[in-house]
């Protein structure tokens, strides 16, 4: 049976297994990805089935993981590297930004860098410092990188396949607090394009745009608003670089209102980019300024305070009300 | 033990003259592998014997002379405003030609940004190296044509790429090797330390070739390390060797040996080529501000080209006609470099949008269209003005 209900974690595991199985050049690298199967068990059982040469436990050195993955890609391999947590990507940030992102352009297109960097990201799991951040804008700002994040199991399965097949480096943000959320995956389906935004709920009064962990919150907010007679459309952006502005524009020109929701700090965040572009594209269709809901310009707080920091149902609904009040 | 050092030992946390980084540690008296003395005498080394024909010796000499000539031309072109910047290799010809000629075609090279001599050995047209210094591209050659990767400006990054590539070579079951070039300054970078760790752990067939040219811009080697650099390898579990970097024969022999070790599956080696950068770090800095004149004079006496010339002449391996002919060839190279650089066209404006991504990208498409329309608006207004 091709259709199966599975968690995002399971879908990623199945997807990685499929990638290893289909292409002998695909490698998985990272800290603890072998016997342990990763701290979130996303690579569970893969080393057992594909061996230590394909699923490679690495020294504890993020720059080394990405830097050697670049070298392996230059040799013709397709490495998928796991960064254990969002806040640990920064030792590798130099290799990602100054090397991985630019090498194809520097070689005038003669070489390709098919490296996938998997990063479990975002908060809401009560973790300690550096385990709950949403640094996607820092990567989306860099030309040469693609940045994506699935919000459900089907996308986790298919977007990972597409990321591995991409000849460009892809930063693959996994919404860690949704790892255990289950939904249906059709492993025989023909997936849509990797960078296409998807309308996950139709509506006519206002558009909510989100990605990754915030899609679920926005769907709940739309359902709650429905009870008050408000018709909210919800878009799952799926890709933060590039962004499918056409789909966002079409929705906004239908509803006249836009609220962007993400966990990352609002300041200089992806919401700012979406607000600016949509204002340029759809100025005369907007009934209200584009509003943003997200994290504050503060260090990610300790776990006992993260519910205040993270956008929840009430904050999204508050923004919906403010927009509709214009 | 001196009174001074005893006093220093009693106050270990106090900065004293003895612990100041300005004081040279024992590395100032290196144990060098040497096969050709600064006076041009052939000497033997128990571990690194080499037997080259007169023709091979002349070829090494030719490589060094032409590389120096190319480098001098590039420096002159920078002074004339034809290049924005140049990183001269003056003084490092032996380290680069010796190691470069140790490589096989199927070996892969990861250079920093000063390896013009290694590029020469790989068959990269020297004028291709000038595009990035002129500002028309950021590389400009296909790394896979000559197995010579693009120059890397961020210090030490390429040592990890070399290590990963070497891991791939081992996975492929190939018997080629990989070489990573870097400098004494780069030895302070975390990426270099990580590349040592990874290459040791995975037994990768990579040779780390550190050209210790004594200066990282204005910072001396003593600002990078308290132990001789080649000794670092021991802590990672692979051999390190210090070679006279101004001795092309020793550089060839030591690198060849390290590459063979890698091919045999015995893992990485660190080669420290002890040499000297005769000029500035790049044309942007002024070495007279940070180093003494007598230091350069002392190193001039160890010049890599002069010593091989002395040996060639004394041994009768080259006659006057060879040197005259090489001089003519050298001038022709200089002329060609001059002409090619001056004729290099600026890139087309629309090329801004090329090669950012291998796959298509809607954001790039959108901005390209906007830029094209903007560019076209000038053509329209020119049309209207007629």
Residue spans for each PLM region:
Chain A
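Thiamine diphosphate
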Residues: 1-169, 173, 308, ...
